[in-house]
Amino acid sequence: MPAHALAPHQLRLIIDPASLGFATTAELQGQPLPWIGQERAQAAAQFGLNLQQPDYHLFVLGEVGSGRASLLRQAMHEAAAQRPVPPDLCYLHNFDHPERPRALRLPAGQGRQLRQGMGNVARNLQADIPKRLASPDFKAEAGRLQQQWQAQESAAFAQLDEFAKARQCNLTREGGQMVFTLTGARGQPLTEAEARALPPERRAEIDLAEQALRAEIGRFLDTMRPLERARDEALAALRRRTIKPLVEQGLDGLRQGLRKQIKDGAKLSQWLERVERALLEHIDLFEPLHDQEPDSDAEADRKDALDDLLARCQVNLVVDNDGRTAAPVVVEDHPTARTLFGSIEHGLDSDTVQSDHTGILAGSLLKAHGGFILLHLQDVAAEEGLWPRLRRFLRCGRLQIEEGAGGGGPAAHGPGAPAALLPEPVDVEVKIVLIGSVEEYYALQEADPDTARRFRAKVDFVE
């Protein structure tokens, strides 16, 4: 090819800025990255990401610097935009088996609505129940029931008192106990010296009278116990009738706010019924103890018990998809058992480790439900025990959050260890994008063919 001499001005390239289509390079932020020379990889990625079939996860082969991660993230976001927003995930207290919290899926945004609604119900009840129990109508009816029982008790005690007087005994009540003393001919209490001075025949009569009186006291107590229970049950029923409209009003308003069709609607209804029952069974916890000082131990115990009750009614929103417009795309750069599968936090109460449904935390797999998650094979393999657990997840498609996942929690054994929580497992639909080198891909094929076959979409970046 012949050589040609060029003039200096021919060595200078001049481009008109108006022809570029942008004012500054800042406008190029967010522009799609080109798949230069990677058309086959692009087609494979789009095929795998858009195919909604089980066991069609993606394995991305390519060397560092090939653009594999950036291009796959871009493709994942494009595919996610075509998918619906997945539901929220909540964990609820299990009233029958507290160690097994219930999982509840709700349409996106309604998990936050349920959590806030239950918080409002709790706050309103704490303010309204004491007011309702202090109302004139309630006090009048409670007083009537108390007077009815008091009349029965007074009549029965009057008979017992007459029985005691007929046997020359004086019957009194001291600190909830029945106390009787011998009386003389004029009804005055006998001193110990006077009692010892009585003739043997009289002392024998007194012994018989004392036995008869003790037996009569026993019959009196046997008669009063069921009457006391009936009074307490009547008062408890009155309290429930008085407070039930408040509880129903709060929970019905919450139900009406959740207008969308809920797949787990039956589960939610059952839980709300159990919440209502628990609140009505413990109405007394909402009312301060009138015979106790505000800082007394008994009042502190009541407040602690109320806090525990309301905690059981809390909603733990572990995955909140409110405000999303597409399926999630999660990039997990530090996969551990804790970050990938979730964990359970613990609290310390009176030197005892405690855990309940409010301590459940979601991992990346739960957050990616309905969408995509990107992992690097090298990172997963470097974490001890993580690959076998991921393999089990791929096999069954269900995720179980476990105690002590990834460390950081309390010891699983010992006197201060809590009863192990077993949150309800949940089905997770997620497309996994696993990035690795060519060597790692074929090593996986040889070492774990059963898992490798679940990555049927092979995205091969050419060098």
Please describe what each predicted stretch is.
Residues 1-463:
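Non-catalytic accessory segments flanking P-loop/AAA+ NTPase cores
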